[in-house]
């Protein structure tokens, strides 16, 4: 039985305690976020498609962990079988470390190793991942002609059936992984000793809790930190926060002695103490729409960014408008378009003055949204939204904002609140509409999971109905927020 795997090795590089907890106390992990679930699904889909770059291979994936020893042996048998040209998820084990290599291709008397990533850029984690796999392969005596990372080509434009040879790019990392072999060997021995400890290693909370990824044991490791601690401030980076923490600054009162009294940092700590929000009203009001608009609409876009382009003329992760809701402040008519037969009761989704459109049933219709938005937005002077994306850029990209009939100004509450240093203890490290609703109105009606799933994969049928409801609810929250600060 193996001790380390690719995922546990990477986790151990980030934090020894997190590695120990995952191996010995996995039940203490935080609940897997919906974002992570969607990301895993996307990675799996891209990995399967990548097999077509080297077709005709044998899938070595085990059905359960109990099959690992069997699959290791089968992999070895295939290495010596000249009839086997390609293997997917080939299983190797060396020095108590197990890997499953995405693609292994016979290359004369040697083998080409390929690890697939669903991103358009390669990160340090991906290189560390490859270095571990090379360490195991080399330790097993597998002769390699090259080791490559395969990732999505951001310049690829779909023109007919997906051309996998053009969709993916490959980068040789052979030189890098050879240079890192000694480093990997040292870490493997160190991390095996960590796992063998009779108790978890004494590792304090620190910058590693969120770098390079948010740790899924924060709920356990941070349980003794007060919920209103200055460590949850966003006005200071983690380096500064933990530098003070390790120097004995353990309370908000002590932290206030280290910073300027009227600074953003101080105001955030006061908000933590009183469980209230802080905003710089001087900045906020300087950003207010001028002159006061006579007609206002609240726009909510649900964008879909498929890793593998679905429609002609699109690129990997290129956004398309999957749905939108438009709420006019003084409209009294309601209309809903595109009702698929699989969604009974859809007409009940109409809210007073709200227009909802989607193409869940047929993504090829997504450009209809552009014509609809050009026509409907032309009736307003101000279009208000709440999105981390730059909505003006999105509208420009799709020629919505350049249309001559459009004379409105886009007002993104997300950007405005951030510029005005809005902060609330419930928001902490991420401003979302759901958290904003809790902070300002002490209410939680919004279910954001459907939005996240649809933006990542757009194949969760159960989320469609919820997403339509959320589009309307989100606009209501945006309207309440705008009216709170600017009316």
What would you call each of these model-derived segments?
Residues 1-109, 239-272, 459-460, 473:
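Metal-dependent nuclease catalytic cores that hydrolyze phosphodiester bonds in DNA/RNA
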Residues 28, 121, 156-157, 252, ...:
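Flexible loop/turn segments at secondary-structure boundaries
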Residues 84-90, 94, 98-102, 113-116, ...:
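Conserved DEDDh/DEDDy metal-dependent 3′-5′ exonuclease domain
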Residues 92, 284-376:
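Conserved RNase H-like, two-metal-ion catalytic cores of nucleic-acid enzymes
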Residues 106-110, 328-331:
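Short acidic-glycine loop/turn motifs at beta-strand connectors
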Residues 203-212, 216-253, 278, 352, ...:
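Helix-loop elements that line ligand-binding/catalytic pockets
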């Amino acid at each position: 039985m193996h001790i380390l795997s690719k995922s546990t090795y990477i986790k151990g590089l980030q934090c020894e305690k997190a590695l120990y907890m995952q191996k010995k106390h996995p039940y203490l992990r935080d609940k897997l976020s919906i974002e992570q679930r969607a990301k895993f699904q996307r990675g799996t889909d891209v990995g399967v498609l990548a097999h077509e770059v080297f077709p005709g291979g044998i899938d070595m994936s085990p059905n359960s962990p109990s099959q690992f020893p069997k699959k290791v042996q089968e992999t070895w048998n295939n290495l010596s079988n000249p009839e086997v040209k390609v293997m997917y998820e080939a299983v190797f084990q060396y020095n108590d470390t197990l890997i499953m290599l995405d693609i292994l291709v016979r290359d004369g008397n040697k083998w080409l190793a390929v690890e697939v990533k669903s991103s358009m850029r390669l990160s340090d984690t991906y290189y560390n991942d490859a270095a571990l796999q090379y360490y195991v392969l080399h330790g097993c005596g597998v002769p390699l002609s090259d080791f490559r990372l395969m990732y999505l080509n951001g310049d690829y434009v779909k023109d007919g059936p997906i051309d996998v040879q053009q969709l993916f790019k490959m980068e040789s990392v052979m030189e890098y992984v050879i240079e890192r072999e000694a480093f990997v060997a040292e870490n493997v021995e160190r991390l095996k000793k960590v796992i063998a400890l009779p108790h978890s290693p004494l590792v304090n909370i620190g910058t590693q809790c969120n770098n390079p990824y948010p740790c899924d044991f924060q709920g356990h490791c941070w349980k003794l930190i007060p919920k209103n601690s200055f460590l949850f401030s966003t006005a200071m980076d983690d380096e500064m926060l933990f530098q003070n923490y390790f120097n004995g600054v353990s309370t908000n009162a002590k932290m206030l002695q280290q910073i300027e009294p009227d600074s953003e940092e101080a105001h955030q700590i006061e908000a933590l103490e009183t469980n209230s929000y802080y905003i710089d009203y001087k900045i906020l009001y300087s950003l207010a729409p001028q002159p006061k608009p006579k007609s206002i609409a609240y726009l909510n876009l649900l964008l879909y960014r498929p890793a593998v382009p679905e429609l002609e003329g699109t690129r990997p992760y290129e956004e398309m408008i999957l749905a939108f809701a438009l709420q006019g402040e003084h409209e009294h008519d309601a209309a809903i378009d595109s009702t698929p037969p699989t969604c009974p009761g859809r007409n009940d989704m109409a809210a007073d003055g709200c227009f909802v459109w989607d193409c869940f049933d047929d993504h090829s219709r997504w450009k209809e949204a552009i014509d609809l938005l050009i026509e409907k937005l032309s009736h307003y002077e101000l279009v208000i939204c709440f999105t981390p994306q730059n909505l003006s850029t999105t509208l420009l990209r799709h020629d919505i904002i350049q249309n001559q009939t459009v004379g409105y100004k886009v007002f993104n509450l997300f950007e405005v609140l951030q510029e005005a240093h809005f902060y609330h203890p419930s928001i902490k490290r991420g401003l979302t509409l759901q958290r904003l609703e809790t902070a300002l109105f002490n209410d939680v009606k919004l279910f954001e999971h459907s939005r996240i799933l649809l933006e990542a994969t757009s194949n969760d049928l159960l989320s469609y109905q919820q997403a339509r409801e959320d589009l309307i609810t989100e606009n209501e929250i945006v309207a309440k927020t705008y009216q709170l600060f600017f009316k």
